[in-house]
Amino acid sequence: MKNSSSMLKGVKSFIGSGIYTNKPIYDVAIVGGGIVGLATGRELLKRNPKLKIVILEKENEIAPHQSSHNSGVIHCGIYYKPGSLRAKLCTKGSKLMYDYCNENQINYENCGKLIVATKKEEFQQLEQLYKRGIENGVPNIKLLESKEQLLSIEPFINGGLRAIHTPSTGIIDYKEVSKSFGNDITEKFGKDSKSEIKLNFNAKNFKYNSNDKLLLISTGDDDDDEEQQQSILTKYSIVCGGMNSDRIAKVAYGNDEPSIVPFRGSFLQFKPEFRHLIKGNVYPLPNASFPFLGVHFTKRINGEVWLGPNAVLSFDREGYKFTDFNLHDTIDLIKNPGLFKLAKKHWKYGLGELYRDFNKDHFIQLLKPYMPNITVDMLEYGGSGVRSQAISKSGDLIEDFIFDTPSDVPIIHVRNSPSPAATSSLAIAIEIVDLAQNNFKNLNSL
């Protein structure tokens, strides 16, 4: 961790400074208006509606990136290592998400999921995954030991031999959930305290004054004219920076590791006349070497059926097309020692994913074991998303949630929030606010 004590030296008092005299002072500033940041703001206000909260989002809308560019699945928690935060928060978060949607009239569908074995050699792995699901408390999970049982749920997955059925898996539009969380902050829980969401606020600079016990967050760099910047003062801050969590940590008293590597995932989709071929979600058995769930069939809440995604290294953290390129993001990739170690181990896998990105026929070869009659003519290009993957300097992919809490500054950094973060968002928020109440002196008395 950086020596935050030395970083605090030389920061002038904010109180009485002409530039900041009229600035509102917030109790908590949450950096990042994605689903995790919004859920965290909601949870803070739910516990204490007197808090004055601000959400700082750099784009012109909330939940613009990972929170809305995803497959829209409410995951059940089967995949994750028992005892891990991912397992605990997904199982808990799934129930909380369904309860929240019922209370707030948000549309979802409990369509279920099959995890399918297509050859006998996969039966042992399927049984092990089933046992993991039991251990993680996945509700109503069932091992389907015959093809007939499988076909009774997904009649066109005639390449499958056995499967796990998780009826608690669902589909939803997380953008709508995020909007509802935002309304909870500004209206339901935070109206009296005048809590708010500030858009187009790109938090770049963080200065903490230990005498004032205030943190200045601004949109400019140190050498920019302070009067030309947007800035706010806050007693505490929680950073839910998603794809930019590593960059924000570097300028906001956080640890240097882990770094973020972006992976773009592209989807195909069934043409409308073929959507009936899938009733819910159909997944392969996961590859133990990677945190991604493989190419799968996903029913969408709007009726579409997506196939994918692949996982291709992205040269633009917020670019959703094959041709998107950002020089800053690319330089960060080149300078990342962990990425080169990862690429050395898995370059063949990476080339295969890249080829699938622009070759439909190669893409569907991964789907034919499940649906042998699928053809390119049934498909068209669908959406895409970019996933933030935390990586260590040794090239290891970091799979669990990470919270970074500098000792001298009242900030919490959410450093890694991989899938199923959207499913788990309400449970993650509880975890973060519990941490804040333990770490932020006087928060409970505000």
UniProtKB/Swiss-Prot annotation:
Annotated EC: 1.1.99.2
InterPro entries: FAD-dep_OxRdtase, FAD/NAD-bd_sf
Single GO MF descriptor: 2-hydroxyglutarate dehydrogenase activity
Primary residence: mitochondrion
Any one cellular-component term (Gene Ontology): mitochondrion
Cellular compartments annotated: Mitochondrion
Cofactor(s) required for function per UniProt: FAD
Keywords: FAD, Flavoprotein, Mitochondrion, Oxidoreductase, Transit peptide
Catalysed reactions listed for this entry: (S)-2-hydroxyglutarate + A = 2-oxoglutarate + AH2
Enzyme class: oxidoreductase
Extent of the transit peptide: 1-28
Protein family (similarity comment): Belongs to the L2HGDH family.
Protein name: L-2-hydroxyglutarate dehydrogenase, mitochondrial
Organism encoding this protein: Dictyostelium discoideum
